[in-house]
Amino acid sequence: MSITLERKAALIAEHARSTGDTGSAEVQVAILSERIANLTEHFKTHKKDNHSRRGLLKLVSQRRRLLDHLKKSDAARYQSLIEKLGLRR
């Protein structure tokens, strides 16, 4: 259910702005999106898991705040990240 270290490293390498970048908004949003996708799959089989559902809502909220910050500070980076992750269909 959680992200493996290899998958997390791949996400960081794919979305990092420079080498060693693990904290930029792009990297954080990519990791959160992966965790949200994993939890969404979990809820397809465990519909009554309300404790995890609360965690999912917190993750979605955190991702929304990061995306809002990125949109305010650099709209071009925001647009490229949205397209790369496939958000806003």
Curated annotation (Swiss-Prot):
Classification via Pfam families: Ribosomal_S15
Annotated disulfide bonds: none
Protein keywords: Ribonucleoprotein, Ribosomal protein, RNA-binding, rRNA-binding
RNA-binding found in the keyword field: yes
InterPro entries according to UniProt: Ribosomal_uS15, Ribosomal_uS15_bac-type, uS15_NS1_RNA-bd_sf
Gene Ontology MF, one: structural constituent of ribosome
GO CC annotations, alphabetized: cytosolic small ribosomal subunit
UniProt-listed SUPFAM superfamilies: S15/NS1 RNA-binding domain
An individual GO BP term: translation
Oligomeric and partner information: Part of the 30S ribosomal subunit. Forms a bridge to the 50S subunit in the 70S ribosome, contacting the 23S rRNA.
Family: Belongs to the universal ribosomal protein uS15 family.
Function per UniProt: One of the primary rRNA binding proteins, it binds directly to 16S rRNA where it helps nucleate assembly of the platform of the 30S subunit by binding and bridging several RNA helices of the 16S rRNA.
Name listed for the protein in its UniProt record: Small ribosomal subunit protein uS15
Biological source species: Caulobacter vibrioides (strain NA1000 / CB15N) (Caulobacter crescentus)
